[in-house]
Amino acid sequence: MRLWTFSDDKKEFDRNKNLINGNLKTVLDDKKISEALIKNSVEKLAGNKRVYILSDHSDIRKQYSTALENLGKVRDLNGNIINGNTVLGSVILDESKQDITLSNITVFSNREKNFVTVKELKDYEDNKIEDDTRIAEIKAAIDDDNYINMRNTLEKHLQDQSTALKKKNPNISICHVHDRGEDSIEYLEFIKDTLGDDTVVRAKKSRNSTQYNINPTTKRKNYIKLIDSKFENKSEYHIDKLTLKGKLYQQVKVSIQWDKLILNNYDYSVVKITLFKRDGTTIYKEPMLLITTINVTSKVIAKEIYHTYLLRVKIEGVFKFLKDVLGWEEFQVRDWESIKNIIAICFFIGGYFYEIKSELTKNETIIMICDLAKSKGKITHYFFLEGMRALLTALRVDLFRKERNISDELYTKMQAYAGIGVEF
């Protein structure tokens, strides 16, 4: 999102910038946007018996930027460390698992002075940090109770949503869905004890099971990886056609196993899923492991846990829409407040387009706008925005012609430079 494209001149640019950089007493900031998103999701969804909160981190990559305030480190698509910042976003699905509502946004950087990793916090408590400046920064953040890290940011982000929904409807049931990286015991206990909610989270393949072998020499227990352990229950079912990352697989066999898992004296369920091609080879190198607070006692429930996790594709689709269509990573401001606020505003605007999704296929005007983008009959957020872009471009051209009093003859000559109307 480029502020300059919303401004006719530098004065208007400065006014727009002041609106989001914190210089005004009343400012549109990321916290206000977060509150508005949560309020909207509560009003819309609190009447449901059960909702699914899908949360994930998304890296805002600024590989070639160097002068941005609080420019942190993130990973590119190949896993390399590059410059950028981090966004934690959430969407909520209603009980039908169809309707998407963008529900919360948190923007932070691991270069902020008050960003203190869990390890760094422990080192501070154990007097292992030697940098006096950093010691002072951590102390100030702790004294002010405003230090942040990946763990407490996630906990606050989820608690704000869970508390708001239950305040409106104390009987609502909430299930949180997460990818790998959020399967720690601390996270599971936070969901179970503090929030009183359910969760389905993908487990890292490095996690140990409670099964073990005894080393005959040392007599020590060698715990078996969860992914390699034996599961008490097993079943399978078949899918005639399955499309994964654009590739079609036919006659797929799904092997699904489930068992109990005790972590820190708490009972959880774990589900292992393996997909087989019709020739008997696996589609993925490793099985998928899911940990859940839900008591899995049958194939039906195990299958439901798997399908619940697969809902994550919906938030991935939201992130892709924000980056590819709304230009989430294209901001051109440097101060941290403006960066946070523009990212949050973009998320909020994305929420609007998901709100009107049901209207896109019904409104004749919207259908025509999509056709303008050569949608070939497809009515989507992408083609709607591309059509709007074409309309706005045409409007700018018309206004320009009127302002400069450009004749049809001169306009035809201008078009010729763009190859319009030229025969080859």
Region spans (language model):
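Intrinsically disordered or highly flexible coil/loop and linker segments, enriched in small
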Residues: 9, 314-319, 331, 354-362, ...
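Short runs of predominantly hydrophobic/aromatic residues within well-ordered alpha helices
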Residues: 287, 302, 315, 341-345
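Generic structural signal for hydrophobic core residues of well-folded globular domains
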Residues: 4-7, 94, 294, 309-312, ...
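Short amphipathic alpha-helical "interface-anchor" segments enriched in bulky aromatics
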Residues: 304-332
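Basic, amphipathic alpha-helical segments enriched in Lys/Arg and hydrophobic/aromatic residues
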Residues: 332-358
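Conserved nucleotidyltransferase catalytic core and NTase-mimicking acidic/glycine-rich helix/loop elements
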Residues: 350-386
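Conserved, well-structured functional cores that handle cations and Mg-NTP chemistry
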Residues: 1-303, 374-424
